[in-house]
């Protein structure tokens, strides 16, 4: 039987670096596509009625004005 070829890594590094290895771009908002609608409704209402979140948003507005 003929020997099977072992894997080779030749030229792979230069190919990947030719256009640069880039980090994946961070998106501002994570997609909610495919997420349970009941969870999304509950999340929206929780954010709306949570006083700690409102405090942090008000602080951000004050800091941005100054």
UniProtKB/Swiss-Prot annotation:
A biological process term (GO) from this entry: cytoplasmic translation
GO molecular function, one term: structural constituent of ribosome
Annotated region (Disordered), positions in chain: 1-66
Compartments in which it is found: Cytoplasm
Main localization of the protein described in the UniProt heading: cytoplasm
This protein's record includes keyword Ribonucleoprotein: yes
Comp. bias intervals (Basic residues): 15-31
Record's keyword annotation contains Cytoplasm: yes
Alphabetical list of Gene3D superfamilies matching this protein: 6.10.140.1730
InterPro entries per UniProt: Ribosomal_eL29 (IPR002673)
Pfam families xrefs: Ribosomal_L29e
GO CC terms in record: cytosolic large ribosomal subunit
Comp. bias (Polar residues): 1-14
Family from the record: Belongs to the eukaryotic ribosomal protein eL29 family.
Protein name stated in the entry: Large ribosomal subunit protein eL29
Organism: Tetrahymena thermophila
Record gene name: RPL29
